Amino acid sequence: TKQQSEMSAADLARRAAQNNTTTLRADPKALREQLGANEMAKFLVEGNDVVEANLLRSGLRSVEPLRGLPLRAIDLGFTYVSDLSPLAGMPLENLILENTNVADLAPLKGMPLKILKLQNTKVTDFKFLEGMKLTHFNVLNLPFSDLNSVRDMPLNTLWLTGSKVTDLTPLSGSRLISLDVERTEVSDLSPLSSVASLKRLNIADTKVTDLSPLAGLSLERIVLSPERIRTGIDTIRAMKSLNYIQTSIEEDLSADEFWKRFDLGVWDDSKQPPSDTSDAPSEPIKPAEPAAPVNP
C-alpha cells in the first residue's frame, strides 16, 4: 500500500543515516570530509568509535556531522562554530570553545563535563552551570561574576582573568590548586587563607595590596604586580615552597632572582633615578596596549 511504501522509505532513510554514522565512527578521514575541516583536524579512535576530536584551527563551521557520536572530548578552539545543539546528549567530559562565536550553552545540560574552557566566547548567561561537577573552568574575558555558581564544584583549576569577579568568598575552603584573577576588581585575599591546596596564584593587575592572608599556604608560583603591594610582602618571602615569581611585565623569575630585583627597588618608583627629559621633544602619549592574559 501507499502507507507501507512511505514507511519503507522512512525506514530506508533511517538505515542510511545509521550506516553513515557507523561509517563516520570507524573512519576519521570520512568524518573530516563531512565536517569540511582542514588537515588540522585530528581524531582519536577506540574500537569502532571516534571518541575525541581535536578541531583546533580546523576551519570548522558546523558540528552537525558529529551528531550522535560518543565523543568524550572536543576542542573547537579558533573555529567558526556558533551552534552546539548537535552535541546535545553526548558523554562529553572535556570541551574547549576558546575564541569561537558560541553564545548558547544550553545544549551542555546534563553532560558529565569536567573541563570547560570558554575564553573569548560570546557567552553571557551562566545558568547552564547548575549541577555541573567541573574540575577545570576557564572564563577569561567574559562577564562572569557570581562564584556562588561554582561553590559546590570539585574545582582544582579556575581561570577568571578579565572577568567581573570581585569577591572570592565563595572559594573559601575549596580544593583549588590553580587560581587566576588577573585584571579583575578583586582586592581581598582573605578567603584564600583556608584554601590549603592552592599552589599557583595569579593576582597581577588587581586591587590586591595585602598579601598577609597567604600566610600558611604553600604556593609554588605566584604572579603579581609588586608595585601595588603595600602589606605582607614578607609573607611570600618566607614561603619556602615558592619557586617562581612572575610580574605583570616580567618573564618567569626564580624566587631568588625576584627578591634580588625587589631589594634593588626595581618596582619601587621612589628608588629609581629621575630621568632627564629637559631636551627631549614632547610627543603625544599613546594609550597602553591591554596586557595579554598570564595564566599561573
State where each predicted segment sits.
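Pro/Ala/Gly-rich low-complexity, hydrophilic intrinsically disordered segments
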Residues: 1-39, 262-279
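Positively charged, low-complexity intrinsically disordered regions
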Residues: 4-5, 15-16, 114, 120, ...
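Concave beta-strand-loop units of leucine-rich repeat
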Residues: 37-61, 70-82, 86-209, 213-281
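Long, low-complexity, intrinsically disordered segments
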Residues: 281-296
